[in-house]
Amino acid sequence: MPLLNPAASRVIDPVLSSVAQGYKHPGMVASALFPQVNVPLRGGKIITFGKEDFMLYNAGRAPGENTKRVSFGYSAGDYALSDYSLEGTVPIENLQEGLNGPGIDHAALAINRVQAIMALRLEKQAADIACAAGSYASANKTTLTSTAQWSDYTGVSQPTRVIETAKEAVRAATGKVPNTIVMGAKVFSALKNHPVIIDRIKYTGRDVVTVELLAALFDVQRVLVGGAIYSNDAGTAFTDVWGKFVVVAYTELGSVADMGAPSYGYTYNLNGYPLVEEPYYDRNAKSWIYPVTRAEAPVLASASAGYLITTAVA
C-alpha cells in the first residue's frame, strides 16, 4: 500500500474551512498593526524596506549610456510559520437538544469558539512583539512617568503633544505619516476623561470621547482599543493583553505579489488556512470532533514605522 503524503492523508472540509477563514473577532486589534499576508510556503524571507523611495536619484542619461536601475524591498531575516491546532467538541446531547430547539449550527459554533481561542493567542503574540521596547530605536520610543502619564490630570501631561512627537519620529524615519494608533483599554479609559482631550472636543457637540473623535484629534485614520484579556492557568487572575502601552504606526495592506509597501508589520498566513479537517465521531466522548488548524506568524517588518509609548498611564 503506497504511503500517503500529508496533503493526501488529510481530508479537508471546504465548507467548514470557509467558516474558519471568514472568522473575525470583534475585540482583537492585532490585524491593524500586523495585517494578514497569505504566503505559499511555511518559511521564507521577511520583506523589509530601505530608503530607496526617498533618495534623490540622478536619472539623467547620456546617449548610449546604460539606464540606471532602482530596486525596492529586500529580504532581511527569515520567517517560519508555526502550526496551531485545536479540536472543537460537540456532545451528541447538544445536537439532540438542538433538534427540538432553535436552528443552532453547532458545527459553526464549535469552530468559532476554537477560532476565538486561537485569535487570543495571536493577539497576545502580536502585542508582545509590538510592545517590546528593545525592538525600537531610541528616537522611536518613550516611557511616561509620574505627572507625564495620561492618568494624571494636574495639567502636566499632554497626550496630544506625545502623539505628535511619535508621528514626527515615524515620518522622519520612513517618510510615511502614521495612520494607526493602538492603545490598551486602560489608556483609552484615561484619555476619555483627560482635561486636554475634553477641552479639544468641547466644540464638536459631542459629550463622550470615542475612538473616532480621538482619530480626528490625533489626525490618523484609525484609533483602536485593545480590550482583550487573558487569564493565568488557574483562571483566577486576568491581565490586559495590551497593558498600558500605545503603539503609533504606519501600516498598509500588502501582498507578496507586489511586495506590499513599507509597513510596520505583517502576519504571514499559509495559503488556504485556517482549515478544518473532516469532523469525526469520538465514541468514548460521545461527541463530534472538529479539528481546526492555523499556520501563521506575526513579524515586525519595520520597527522604524512605529513608535512605542510605555506606561502611558499609571
Residue ranges and their predicted role:
Residues 92-177, 185-199, 313-314:
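Alpha-helical scaffold segments that mediate packing/assembly in large oligomeric complexes
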Residues 177-180, 244-246:
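Short, surface-exposed beta-edge/turn micro-motifs
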Residues 2-61, 75-82, 145-154, 198-314:
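Sequence/fold signature of self-assembling virion shell proteins
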Residues 74-99:
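Short acidic, glycine/tyrosine-flanked loop/strand segments centered on an H-E-D-like triad
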Residues 65-70:
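Hydrophobic, aromatic-lined core segments that form the binding pocket/scaffold
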Residues 180-184, 224-225:
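A structural signal for short, well-ordered beta-strand segments and their strand-loop junctions
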Residues 85-87, 178, 287:
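Broad gene-expression machinery/nucleic-acid interaction feature
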